[in-house]
Each structure stands twice: as C-alpha cells, then as structure tokens.
C-alpha cells in the first residue's frame, strides 16, 4: 500500500464534502476530514470505547421504494467520485437483478438515481440465484469491483454495469461440496473488500474460516485475506494471503484500508438474546505481514504468522442516540452492519457503516456515522 495518488486525493476530498454529519458535532466531522480544527473533547458522552465516538445515524433509506424498486440488502459502502455519490451493492434478493445503489449525504442519505444493474459479459443480468454481492470498491479508472459469496468471486464491472473481468481465487476458497478442493462455508466466504490508498492493491477478507484452518478442538477463529497487486499491464494478480484471528464466535463482515498500509477490520456476531455485536479493530503494517499462502492450517501456524490487531471501537458500548429497534438488541443503535467506509486516518477519521436489512421487516437499513481515532 504505497502513498496516496491524485485519484485518491480527489476522491477523499469529494467524499469529505459529501460526508455531512449532524450539526451538533459538525466541527468534529470537519476535523476528521481535515476541514476544521475541532477536537473530540466535547464528545465524551458519545464514546464507543476505547477510541470511537457515535456522531449520528439515519434510517432514511429503510424500506424505501424508488421508482418502483425496493431498496434493501445493502452490504457494502464506497465512494464513487465520478458520480459524486456513495454506492452500495445489494447482496441478493431472489430473482431480482443484482444492483448498485447511489446516494448522497451519509447523515441523511438520499438516493440520487436509478440503481445500476450488474450484468454478465453477454448482457444478461446477475440475480440472487447466481450472485451474493457483499463487497464493493471503486477502482481508480471508475470501474466497480464487486465480491460475491456464491462461488466466491471478485468481478470487475464497467460503469455500464457489464462484467469486464474477474480476479483469480485459490481453489480451496470455493464453497465445500461445489468443487473437490473447496473448504469454505456457504454464505461465509469473500465478504470484505477494499482498495489501498495507492489504488494498486486490492484486499478481500473471508467472513468465516476455511475448514482446513479449523483446529482439532474446533477453533474457527483463523481467517484469510487475499491480496492482489496491479501489474504493469493493468491486470490484477494474487500475490499473497494474510492471516487474521477474530474473537471467538465472531465473523468478518468488512475490511477497509487506510493510511499507508493499515486496515480497519469489522468483527461481528449475533445472538437471539443480545442481538448484534460489532467491534472495529485496527491492523498496522499490513504490507509487512507474513505470506501464509503455503500454510496448510493456520491453527497450527506460529503466532507470528497472524497479524496483530488493536480494538478501536466497541459499538455495543456506544450511546443509543435514541435509535429505535424492531428486535432484541443490547444496544438499539445496532443492526446488521456489513458495509463500511473511512474518510481520513491515521488519527481522527470519519467511519460510516451501513446495515443489511435482508429485506426483513424486523431489521433496518441504517447508516451509522462515527469518529474513530485510528493508530
């Protein structure tokens, strides 16, 4: 992850302008995006320990129908400078076409246009029967990068929504039973997706563990990240794998790059008695992390093969901000947050998350805006 390039600077500047937060803490939002000098001193009552602060939330997208199309199932969040809009992909919804939605202002999101339908090279639309689009990033040339849990796959789509290419995925990452070498659990494959600040490195994270990385005692906390570098020809090549360990019982819905070579990882879990839980962990020096591509079983690997992480925000401990809930939650502000984006960092950064309502009457499509001090 090299230093930022002009395309990213322009994107970050536009994203900063688009990230309008609640008036009560607008100065702190400016600080997070480099447009003001305020500090977080006045946000103690909004703490999400140890280093996060809840700024605002919005349910304005919840159960929205736009030009006859139901919005829901949003599982990713990225900024598209060419559209001057935030973008989010629908994971899957039966035979409905796979779509990317566009909206502005994360404090009070408003849809800006009809969604973009994602299509195969022959022009036929992907749908919920053959894609489960969980990750989304915008490449420097404006193409859309989308990860799907179905196979899994990582595909590149043009701005017309037509697939242009796909990235190579190691055989063992296929869902168990779909191929002879597959070790992934269905609906727990390539969920997180991000592009480095340089625009030349892609990272995708596994939501769950490969069966080959589970210990004899059943420890399934070891996850793999795939790292791709861009060749001089412009094509993307898989260059290495990174090992990451979650807290027991957690999955990884999202990963986002920030700074020179740092990552922010979202860990999450759900229980019927406590609802959703989410924590954000920072990983520094990802570029120097050991390559574990040839490690057969991460649970038997030396501790040094697994990246170190630091808890920066426990969202269960955020203030509720008066948020409503339709199901049992230890904190009603929480829902099924699966998409995440960062403006700024290291230091004080604006972090926003979006929840996947699964097109369910008991869940929200909610945007949560935070300030987080990132190492």
Language model segments and positions:
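Sequence/structural signature of beta-propeller domains
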Residues: 2-4, 30-375
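Secretory targeting and sorting signals
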Residues: 1-31
């Amino acid at each position: 992850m090299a230093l930022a390039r002009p395309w990213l600077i322009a994107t970050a500047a536009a994203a900063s302008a688009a990230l309008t937060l609640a008036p009560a803490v607008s100065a702190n939002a400016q600080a997070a995006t480099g447009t003001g000098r305020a500090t977080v001193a006045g946000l103690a009552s909004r703490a999400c320990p140890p280093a996060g602060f809840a700024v605002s939330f919005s349910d304005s997208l919840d159960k929205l129908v736009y030009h006859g199309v139901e919005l829901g199932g949003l599982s990713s969040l990225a900024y598209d400078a060419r559209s001057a809009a935030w973008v989010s992909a629908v994971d899957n919804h039966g035979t409905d076409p796979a779509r990317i939605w566009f909206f502005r202002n994360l404090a009070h999101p408003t849809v800006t246009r009809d969604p973009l339908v994602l299509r195969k090279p022959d022009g036929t639309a992907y749908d919920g029967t053959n894609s489960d689009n969980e990750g989304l990033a915008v490449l420097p040339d404006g193409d859309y990068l989308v990860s799907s849990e179905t196979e899994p796959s990582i595909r590149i789509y043009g701005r017309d929504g037509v697939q242009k290419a796909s990235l190579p995925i190691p055989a063992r990452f296929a869902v168990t039973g779909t191929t002879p070498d597959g070790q992934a659990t269905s609906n727990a494959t390539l969920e997180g997706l991000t592009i480095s600040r340089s625009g030349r490195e892609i990272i995708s994270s596994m939501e769950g563990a490969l069966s080959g990385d589970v210990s004899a005692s059943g420890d399934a906390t070891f996850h793999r990240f795939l790292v791709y570098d861009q060749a001089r020809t412009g094509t993307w090549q898989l260059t290495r794998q990174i090992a990451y360990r979650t807290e027991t019982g957690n999955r990884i819905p999202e990963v986002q790059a920030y700074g020179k070579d740092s990552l922010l990882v979202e860990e999450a879990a759900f229980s019927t008695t406590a609802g959703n839980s989410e924590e954000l962990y920072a990983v520094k020096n990802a570029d120097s992390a050991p390559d574990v591509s040839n490690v057969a079983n991460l649970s038997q690997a030396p501790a040094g093969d697994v990246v170190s992480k630091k808890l920066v925000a426990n969202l269960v401990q955020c203030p509720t901000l008066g948020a409503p809930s339709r199901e049992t939650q230890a904190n009603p502000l929480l829902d099924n947050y699966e998409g995440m984006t960062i403006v700024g960092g290291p230091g004080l950064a604006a972090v926003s998350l979006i929840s996947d309502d699964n097109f369910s009457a008991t869940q929200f499509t909610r945007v949560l805006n935070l300030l987080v001090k990132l190492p």
